Amino acid sequence: MTTSTIHIATAKSSDIAELVQLIRQYWEYEQLKPFDGDAIANLVAEVIAHPEIGQCWIARDDAGIQGYLVGSCVPNFEYGGLLALIADLYVASDARRSGVGQQLVHAAELAMRARGCVHIAMEVAAKNVRAQQFYSILGFATRAGYSMMHKAL
């Protein structure tokens, strides 16, 4: 578990290499294959260069980046404004249960609210009960009768 002070900030170009290593850990945790570090580095660079498509917040302590959150804002007529979406949230295994995830979500919520978002959502794996409990503590609730659907483009 991390013991030094965590600082939350938006990712910068100088964070890309270290961030890609943490994203690799996420892919291993979720058993996603194959991991293409160069493609992920290019995507992170794109997000950093164009915050209008999304933002990446990082949690850093003296040991390095301990977690990240990727989010974006999209127009949503149902909610009557912008909808904030959390695309990814990952905290390094040895930094979990230390408040890192909560700090990342809080920072993203503040920034997205400042951008005009009126609601926030994310998908959580049905089997990931621990994550569901975490989000519930932060005030999130399952939307009854709805499920996330996907299609590759």
Describe the role of every protein-language-model region.
Residues 1-4:
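Basic/polar N-terminal segments that are highly enriched at the extreme N-terminus
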Residues 105, 113-123:
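Conserved GNAT acetyl-CoA-binding A-motif
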Residues 91, 97-110, 133, 137:
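Conserved acetyl-CoA-binding loop-helix of GNAT-fold acetyltransferases
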Residues 102, 126-145:
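Conserved active-site alpha-helix within GNAT-family acetyltransferase domains
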